[in-house]
Amino acid sequence: MARYIFITGGVVSSLGKGLASAALGALLQARGYKVRLRKLDPYLNLDPGTMSPYQHGEVFVTDDGAETDLDLGHYERFTGRPATKQDNITTGRIYQDILTKERRGDYLGATIQVVPHVTNAIKEFIVSDNDGYDFVLVEIGGTVGDIEGLPFFEAIRQIKNDLPRGDVIYIHLTLLPYIPSAGELKTKPTQHSVKELRSIGIQPDILLCRTDRPIPKEERRKLGLFCNVRESAVIEARDADSIYAVPEAYHAAGLDDEVLAAFAIAAKEPPQLGRWHEINERIRNPEGAVTIAIVGKYTGMKDAYKSLIEALSHGGIANKVQVKLDWIESEVFENEDPAPFLEHVNGILVPGGFGQRGAEGKIEAARFARERNVPYFGICFGMQMAVIEAARNLAGIEQANSTEFGPTPEPLVGLMTEWVRGNELEKRSQAGDLGGTMRLGAYPATLKRGSRVSQVYGGVTEISERHRHRYEVNTAYKDRLEQHGLKFSGMSPDGVLPEIVEYEDHPWFIGVQFHPELKSRPFDPHPLFASFVQAALVQSRLV
């Protein structure tokens, strides 16, 4: 039977509960345990699919097509276990399910209340389908005291009494701020946070304390005394230069030992952390550096590109180089020459996005990369803009555009109205809802034998990648574009949907309709990112 670890947060948001959960999951895995990680999000949206990138950050897409919180990306990257739609739930989804049952009459006329109906639904989600796992780590979004989070805290309070004694522990992630004028770390915010947590019936077993400096013994003693935890359970979570240094740091601080002790499990062998040590050595001691320009639409919110940033770092690990990122808002290129911004970079990456704002700037970035022989990686929207650039400037289709931006006489990119998923035909229309209606999740693609992209993937001709898009390149223009050098080297198995384009006579120019960054891991870098960084490294030696 699985044991449950609940990770809560206090004092301030954005302390890194998702990263802490992922790091602890990796440590337990390294001890030979099988782990599952889940995220509870208290917001009323059904999922983050229609939320602004500036408010939510990245939407992480799973193989089975769920649009989820970006923390699930941390879970996958640290443990290697693919997340599913059953690993993330929101208040909105819970309420939708409850109200559907109420309309159906499932509650037999009962008054529907937060307790017990909402809390029971949360508990059912937490404990469902956990057979075969040793530990289930559950992160509760937000901070203790948030009104919207109260049903979740009540549910995890109840669940300790529902399960056998000793099967549940609580870890509270908090902040110890340093006050320069006083010259000391302050424990009072943490004491108040734990007091709030205890007032709703939850006594934390472990305090994970974010800090930028060592915690003095006296402060540990004080936290243990006033928060009612053992002094050994006050774990120092020091700021790290790399997120991949966190598992080793947490182990050195005793987190995994304390977790096992809280469950009364005798630690037999130390965790096998050799692979973590190896990648951290590569990160700390690179043999070179490359600069990649990310020409995006949401560069003011780096979390909107979280998996992309990590995938590029994985490409750097694979090539033993540091990847430096130069963030450029694509709208800049609509009024200014891109050359001064891009002449010094070793590669250009144009990521996904939605809407007309900044689209022309992305087209200019693709043109610069093509004409100057700079490695170019276009992802989703970035591929579509590269195709429009080729149509306008190589094939002479001056009015080439996307119907996403409005009516156009030359629809190089258009709305997908139907596609095949498994054995079923999916259909969409312009009048449909926005939420949950895109082409989402893992789909197969067939690669052209002998193409550059096939070589990047190791010579295979069949791949599976995750998608999140509503628009697709129009195959009616395929022959004209190929006559001018832009090759369609990857297609859906039925030959209907273009998946990959490339230039054969360019050092490295690849556009993909899918999101390869979602499947990259520090120990298994995605081949496209490893190859792109390698091409950037070659380019860096030419200038």
Swiss-Prot record:
It catalyses: UTP + L-glutamine + ATP + H2O = CTP + L-glutamate + ADP + phosphate + 2 H(+); L-glutamine + H2O = L-glutamate + NH4(+); UTP + NH4(+) + ATP = CTP + ADP + phosphate + 2 H(+). Mg(2+) binds at D71, E139. Its EC number is 6.3.4.2. It comes from the Bacteria. GO terms for biological process: 'de novo' CTP biosynthetic process; pyrimidine nucleobase biosynthetic process. Residues 291-542 form the Glutamine amidotransferase type-1 domain. ATP binds at S14, L15, G16, K17, G18, L19, D71, R238, D239, A240. L-glutamine binds at Y54, G353, F381, G382, M383, Q384, E404, R470. GO terms for molecular function: ATP binding; CTP synthase activity; glutaminase activity; identical protein binding; metal ion binding. The active site is at C380, H515, E517. Catalyzes the ATP-dependent amination of UTP to CTP with either L-glutamine or ammonia as the source of nitrogen. Regulates intracellular CTP levels through interactions with the four ribonucleotide triphosphates. NCBIfam families: PRK05380.1, PyrG. Homotetramer. Belongs to the CTP synthase family. This is CTP synthase.
